[in-house]
Amino acid sequence: MSQGLQLLFLGCACSLAPAMAMREVTVACSETADLPCTAPWDPQLSYAVSWAKVSESGTESVELPESKQNSSFEAPRRRAYSLTIQNTTICSSGTYRCALQELGGQRNLSGTVVLKVTGCPKEATESTFRKYRAEAVLLFSLVVFYLTLIIFTCKFARLQSIFPDISKPGTEQAFLPVTSPSKHLGPVTLPKTETV
């Protein structure tokens, strides 16, 4: 076999290696997920392990700091270099990467695991907002309509002098009590009339 063909096969094998190292774990909502580290490792050597959740933008955010043991993320000793996520939610779904660093610092190995959490209810706030969005828009529209109606009614009434502007000089206040001077109100007697 020629050297060029061997390099081609080697290149294909190297490009397929990350795809073969990726494993998928499916777990039901609120259950415990055990993610095994798929990096190839030598049982004769000791490694320091770190786990990270790969975000959609491609950057990694560390989910398991070495100092936090009370977190819902823990690395138990049941299975070497595995990550246990307790009480999984839909937010737990995603791609996780384990990195093994040889204690001598000579080799770094990594593997990828995809976690799928099924059976979780959708976000309550999001579905509630979607459910009542039309009613909220209608209520807001009615409030705006009634405020506009009140404002235009007051302006129209002022223009028609129903409610005169008393701050302007020369205008009288409406609804003042009207009294007539020196008119005595007493019993009224009607003259007698004859019927024919």
Curated annotation (Swiss-Prot):
The keyword Plastid does not apply. It comes from the Eukaryota. This is CD83 antigen. Glycans are attached at N70, N87, N108. It is a single-pass type I membrane protein. Abundantly expressed in spleen and brain, but is also detected in most tissues analyzed. The chain crosses the membrane at residues 134-154. Transmembrane glycoprotein predominantly found on the surface of many immune cells including dendritic cells or lymphocytes that plays various roles in immune response regulation. Plays an essential role in CD4(+) T-selection, differentiation and stability by regulating the activity of the major E3 ubiquitin ligase responsible for controlling MHC II trafficking MARCHF8. Also inhibits MARCHF1 association with MHC II and ubiquitination of MHCII. In addition, acts as an important modulator of protective responses against acute infections.
